[in-house]
C-alpha cells in the first residue's frame, strides 16, 4: 500500500512543545504522531495510530502463541466487584469514580482483575475447563496527580492485561513462566534494552512479582543491579541486610545530654564530637545517630461509623546517615497513604519536639513505631530525647525502646551490599514497561470461585496477572532509539517500511519515483510517498529524518545517471544504488 504525503493528515512542527521535557514527548508531538487534548490525555493521529496498532500486534502475536484468548471488557465498570476486593477504597484518589443519573457508583477501569475473576466464576465450573489464559488490549484510566512525559505517564493509556487461571500452584508457576518468556520475546522484537527486576506487589496483592524496566536515564523508576550476580530489583523491593543482634546486658546506660541547637543530623554529629562522645573509640558519624521521622498513615476505607479513617501518627526510625525514601516507605505500607507530619501537626501534638524527636515518645503516647531493619536488638544510638536541645547517647534497641515492626524506608545507595550476598549494588534509572504477578487465590477467594476437581471436590483456582503498557512501549522505543535528527523506528513497528522522497523537479524523475513507490508496494511493502509538489527538498529531508522510517529512498540529482540514494535511518548510513536494482535492494533490507 502507498500513502501519499500530499493527502496525508500530517503536520510536523519545527519547535518543541512548551510542556515537553523528554525527547520522546517532544519528537512524537513534533512529528505529528500525537496531540495533547488535556493534561495526561492525548489523541492518536494517523501516523501514531499506525505504530500503536503494530505494537499491539506484536503483543497479540506472542499472547496468542502461549494460548491466550482475547476478549474485551467495558471501560465503564460498576462499583460492586471492586468493593468485594476492597480496591474501591484501596486505589485511593487515582481511581476515576463517577455516578450515573440514578446515583449509582461506577468507575473507569484502571485494571480488570475483578472482572476477569467474575467472568470465570460465572462461566466455568469444572477442572476440565482449565487452565485458561484470557487477555485484552484496552484503554485504562488512572487519575494521575501529576501527568507528565507525554504518553509515558498519562491519565488514559492503552494496556494489555492478561490473567491465567489454574487449578494448582504448579500450574500457576508454568503460566507465569510462559508469560515471562513471552514478554522477553515482545521486548526483544521491539529492540528495547530492558532489565527484569524483583518488584513489590502493591495494591495488586499476591506473592511473586517482577517488573520489566526499560533502561532510560530520565526514567522515573530506580532499580539496582549486583556487580557479581544476576540480582536486579526495583529500589522499592530491595531488602536491607540487618546486622546480627547483640546482647543488651553489657551495654552502658543511656545518658541524656544538653545539645543546644543540634536539631539536624549534621549539627548533632558536630555537637557529639565537640562533647567528646565516641563510638567504639572512634569519632561519631551520622551512621551512629538515629533519625526519627513522624508520618501520618491513612488506611483506605471507612470505620464502623462510615467515616473515612483518620490519619494515624507513626514513627519511622532510620539510621541518621540515610534519607527516607518515600517511595520505599509507601510501597512498604501500601495500600495506606503516607505523608510526612507538617508544622501544624507539631503544634497540635506538643510531645513531638521538632528536631529532637526520639523513639521513646512513640511508645509513651501509644503511637506505632516502625524501624529500619538495621535498628536491631542491641544496637546503640544517639537520638532525640523529646525535649528541646536534648539528646540521648547509648539508647539501645530492645532495651530502651522496641519497634512495633520493621519497614523498608531508608534510601538505597550505590555500593550497598547486594541482598543475595554477592557483590554490591549499582543504581540505574528505568521506565516500567511490564509487570507480572502471581496473585494466588486473593481474588478467586474474594469472589468465592469454586471449581469441581477431578475427585468432585470444590477447589479454589489460582491466578496470575500480567500487564504491558502498550502505548508506553511506543514512547519507550522513541526514547531509546531517537537521535538528534528525530525518531528512528525499528522495522517491527515502523509506520511504513520505506519512505520515498521526490527531490528533483524533473518530470521524468517524478514519474520514476511514482513507479518505484508502486513497485515497492506491489512487492508487499508499506510505502510513505512524499509527493508534495510545493515543498523544498530540504524540508522533505528534515521531515524524513523526523518521521523516522527505517529506510528512505531519494530520487534526486543522481537520477540522471540512473542512481537513487538509499538512507538507512537506523544506522545513519547512506549509499547510492542503481534505480533498476532499488526494489530488490530495499525489499531485501526490509525483510531482513
Swiss-Prot record:
Pfam families to which the protein is assigned, alphabetical: HGTP_anticodon, tRNA-synt_2b, tRNA_edit
CDD domains: ProRS_anticodon_short, ProRS_core_prok
Example GO molecular function: aminoacyl-tRNA deacylase activity
EC identifiers of the protein: 6.1.1.15
Cellular component GO terms held in the UniProt record: cytosol
Transmembrane segments: none
Catalytic activity annotation: tRNA(Pro) + L-proline + ATP = L-prolyl-tRNA(Pro) + AMP + diphosphate
Enzyme category, top tier: ligase
Coiled coil segments of this chain: none
PROSITE patterns named among the record's database cross-references: AA_TRNA_LIGASE_II
GO terms of biological process kind: prolyl-tRNA aminoacylation
Xref: Gene3D superfamilies: Anticodon-binding domain, Bira Bifunctional Protein, Domain 2
Compartment(s): Cytoplasm
Stored HAMAP family: Pro_tRNA_synth_type1 (MF_01569)
Domain remarks in the Swiss-Prot or TrEMBL record: Consists of three domains: the N-terminal catalytic domain, the editing domain and the C-terminal anticodon-binding domain.
Record note on quaternary structure: Homodimer.
Function description: Catalyzes the attachment of proline to tRNA(Pro) in a two-step reaction: proline is first activated by ATP to form Pro-AMP and then transferred to the acceptor end of tRNA(Pro). As ProRS can inadvertently accommodate and process non-cognate amino acids such as alanine and cysteine, to avoid such errors it has two additional distinct editing activities against alanine. One activity is designated as 'pretransfer' editing and involves the tRNA(Pro)-independent hydrolysis of activated Ala-AMP.
Protein name: Proline--tRNA ligase
Organism the protein comes from: Corynebacterium urealyticum (strain ATCC 43042 / DSM 7109)
Classification of source organism: Bacteria, Bacillati, Actinomycetota, Actinomycetes, Mycobacteriales
Amino acid at each position: 500500500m502507498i500513502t501519499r504525503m500530499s493527502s496525508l493528515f500530517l503536520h510536523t512542527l519545527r519547535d518543541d512543545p512548551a510542556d515537553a521535557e523528554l525527547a520522546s514527548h517532544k519528537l512524537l508531538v513534533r512529528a505529528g504522531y500525537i496531540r495533547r487534548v488535556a493534561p495526561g490525555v492525548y489523541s492518536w493521529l494517523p501516523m501514531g495510530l499506525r505504530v500503536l496498532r503494530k505494537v499491539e500486534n506484536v503483543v497479540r502475536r506472542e499472547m496468542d502463541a502461549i494460548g491466550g484468548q482475547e476478549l474485551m471488557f467495558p471501560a465503564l465498570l460498576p462499583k460492586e466487584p471492586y468493593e468485594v476486593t476492597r480496591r474501591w477504597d484501596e486505589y485511593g484518589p487515582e481511581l476515576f469514580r463517577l455516578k450515573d443519573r440514578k446515583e449509582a457508583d461506577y468507575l473507569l477501569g484502571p485494571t480488570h482483575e475483578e472482572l476477569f475473576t467474575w467472568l470465570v466464576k460465572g462461566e466455568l465450573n469444572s477442572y476440565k475447563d482449565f487452565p485458561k489464559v484470557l487477555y485484552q488490549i484496552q484503554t485504562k484510566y488512572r487519575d494521575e496527580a501529576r501527568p507528565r512525559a507525554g504518553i509515558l505517564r498519562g491519565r488514559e493509556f492503552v494496556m494489555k492485561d492478561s490473567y491465567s487461571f489454574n487449578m494448582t500452584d504448579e500450574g500457576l508457576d508454568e503460566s507465569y513462566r510462559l508469560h515471562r518468556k513471552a514478554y522477553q520475546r515482545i521486548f526483544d522484537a521491539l529492540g528495547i534494552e530492558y532489565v527484569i527486576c524483583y518488584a513489590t506487589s502493591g495494591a495488586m496483592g499476591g506473592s511473586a512479582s517482577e517488573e520489566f524496566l526499560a533502561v532510560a536515564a530520565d526514567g522515573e523508576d530506580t532499580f539496582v543491579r549486583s556487580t557479581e550476580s544476576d540480582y536486579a530489583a526495583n529500589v522499592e523491593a530491595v531488602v536491607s541486610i540487618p546486622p546480627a543482634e547483640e546482647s543488651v546486658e553489657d551495654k552502658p546506660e543511656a545518658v541524656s545530654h544538653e545539645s543546644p541547637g543540634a536539631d539536624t543530623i549534621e549539627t548533632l554529629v558536630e555537637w557529639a564530637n565537640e562533647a567528646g562522645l565516641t563510638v567504639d573509640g572512634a569519632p561519631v558519624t551520622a551512621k551512629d545517630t538515629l533519625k526519627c521521622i513522624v508520618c501520618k498513615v491513612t488506611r483506605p476505607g471507612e470505620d464502623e461509623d462510615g467515616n473515612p479513617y483518620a490519619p494515624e501518627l507513626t514513627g519511622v526510625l532510620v539510621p541518621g546517615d540515610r534519607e527516607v525514601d518515600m517511595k520505599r516507605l509507601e510501597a512498604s505500607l501500601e495500600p495506606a497513604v503516607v505523608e510526612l507530619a507538617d508544622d501544624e501537626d507539631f503544634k497540635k501534638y506538643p510531645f513531638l519536639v521538632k528536631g529532637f524527636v526520639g523513639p521513646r515518645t512513640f511508645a509513651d503516647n501509644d503511637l506505632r513505631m516502625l524501624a529500619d531493619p538495621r535498628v536491631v536488638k542491641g544496637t546503640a544510638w544517639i537520638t532525640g530525647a523529646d525535649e528541646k536541645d536534648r539528646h540521648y547517647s547509648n539508647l539501645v534497641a530492645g532495651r530502651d525502646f522496641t519497634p512495633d515492626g520493621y519497614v523498608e524506608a531508608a534510601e538505597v545507595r550505590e555500593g550497598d551490599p547486594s541482598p543475595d550476598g554477592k557483590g554490591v549494588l549499582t543504581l540505574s534509572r528505568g521506565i516500567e514497561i511490564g509487570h507480572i504477578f502471581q496473585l494466588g487465590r486473593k481474588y478467586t477467594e474474594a469472589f468465592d470461585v469454586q471449581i469441581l476437581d477431578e475427585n468432585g471436590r470444590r477447589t479454589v483456582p489460582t491466578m496470575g496477572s500480567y500487564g504491558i503498557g502498550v502505548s508506553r512501549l511506543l514512547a519507550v522505543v522513541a526514547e531509546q532509539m531517537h537521535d538528534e535528527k528525530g525518531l528512528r523506528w525499528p522495522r517491527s513497528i515502523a509506520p511504513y517500511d520505506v519512505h520515498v522522497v521526490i527531490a528533483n523537479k524533473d518530470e521524468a524523475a517524478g514519474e520514476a519515483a511514482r513507479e518505484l513507490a508502486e513497485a515497492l508496494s506491489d512487492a508487499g511493502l508499506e510505502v510513505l510517498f512524499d509527493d508534495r509538489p510545493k515543498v523544498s527538498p530540504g524540508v522533505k529531508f528534515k521531515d524524513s529524518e523526523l518521521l523516522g522510517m527505517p529506510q528512505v529512498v531519494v530520487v534526486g540529482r543522481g537520477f540522471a545517471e540512473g542512481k537513487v540514494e538509499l538512507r538507512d535511518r537506523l544506522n545513519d548510513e547512506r549509499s547510492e544504488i542503481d534505480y533498476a536494482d532499488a526494489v530488490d535492494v530495499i525489499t531485501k533490507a526490509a525483510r531482513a
